[in-house]
């Protein structure tokens, strides 16, 4: 898997390099690099050269891909989403800032929602499968429609399951969003290597969905409401029945807008007005 990941990263870096090379004679006010660890240094230097202000966003734990530490000092602003990384490395890397993932706030047509449907779609990762199976097994005890899909990529089908479906390729983002919006609840499985919140958390926030997650760090955020987000901790599902029966509690629009891509982009580029997107543990940034 590691070898294939490197091949994919090299291909991605090459494609980005080709685009940047065509822009070599131009200059830009800003450049934002998502997952800078995936770019080769030659490509990254090309990006940095054509922009006046540079921002990077690592939507993975820093220690999961440690090669990223080499490029942090190259950027004006370097954002991390794991609530453990900013406090841990801020002293060494002064340009390090905390933020979260986001949801895309472009308009979407209304859809018919099935409040009893629970949806999960994601890439197959060995470290997440055990937690996913436990959640699915527990949810099968209730009168729910479970829509659970794993994308295998280059892997073979790992096992058969009466609920979980598999495919080699994922669907387009808009198709995924439409499926997610039709569900009443979303599932979220934490990656073992970090405590950052996935995009699913913010999709649930944007579309007023209940969320079932095993990422307990979600409790640190201002949008957390126990009636909207059920946290599976140490494999314990106590209180799930009451959670499923309770109605969703709408959140203030100000909180919802805080986690939009529009606000995220203004924060990333330091273009006020914006709201800082952080957890309750990151308030040192505001001082």
Q: Where on the chain are the PLM-derived regions?
A:
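C-terminal "capping" alpha-helix adjacent to the active site of nucleotide-linked donor transferases
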Residues: 231-251
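Catalytic alpha-helical scaffold of carbohydrate-active enzymes acting on polysaccharides/glycoconjugates
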Residues: 45-46, 64
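Nucleotide-sugar donor-binding patch of glycosyltransferase catalytic domains
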Residues: 220-235
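Short beta-strand/loop segments at the ligand-binding rim of alpha/beta enzyme cores
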Residues: 48-58
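Nucleotide-sugar donor-binding catalytic core of glycosyltransferases
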Residues: 1-28, 34-43, 59, 70-198, ...
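A short, well-ordered alpha-helix in the C-terminal region of glycosyltransferases
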Residues: 246-263
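Short alpha-helix at the nucleotide-sugar/activated-sugar donor binding site of glycosyltransferases
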Residues: 180, 204-205
């Amino acid at each position: 898997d590691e070898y294939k990941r490197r091949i994919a990263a090299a291909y991605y870096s090459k494609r980005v390099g080709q685009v940047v090379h065509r822009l070599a004679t131009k200059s830009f006010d800003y450049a934002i690099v998502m997952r800078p660890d995936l770019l080769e240094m030659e490509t990254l230097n090309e990006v940095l050269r054509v922009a006046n202000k540079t921002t990077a966003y690592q939507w993975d734990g820093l220690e999961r891909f440690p090669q990223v530490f080499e490029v942090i000092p190259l950027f004006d602003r370097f954002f991390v989403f794991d609530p453990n990384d900013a406090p841990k490395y801020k002293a060494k890397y002064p340009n390090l800032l905390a933020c979260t993932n986001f949801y895309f706030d472009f308009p979407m047509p209304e859809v018919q929602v099935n409040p009893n449907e629970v949806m999960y779609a994601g890439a197959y990762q060995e470290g997440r499968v055990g937690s996913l199976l436990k959640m699915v097994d527990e949810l099968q005890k209730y009168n729910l429609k479970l829509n659970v899909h794993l994308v295998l990529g280059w892997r073979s089908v790992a096992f058969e399951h009466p609920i979980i479906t598999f495919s080699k390729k994922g669907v387009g983002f808009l198709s995924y969003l439409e499926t997610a919006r039709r569900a009443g609840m979303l599932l979220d499985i934490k990656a073992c290597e970090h405590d950052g919140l996935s995009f699913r958390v913010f999709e649930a926030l944007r579309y007023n969905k209940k969320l079932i997650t095993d990422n307990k760090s979600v409790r640190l955020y201002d949008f957390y409401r126990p009636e909207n987000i059920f946290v599976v901790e140490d494999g314990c599902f106590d209180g799930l029945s009451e959670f499923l029966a309770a109605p969703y509690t709408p959140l203030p629009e100000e909180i919802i807008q805080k986690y939009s891509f529009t606000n995220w982009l203004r924060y990333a580029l330091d273009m006020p007005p914006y709201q800082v997107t952080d957890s309750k543990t990151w308030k040192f940034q505001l001082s």
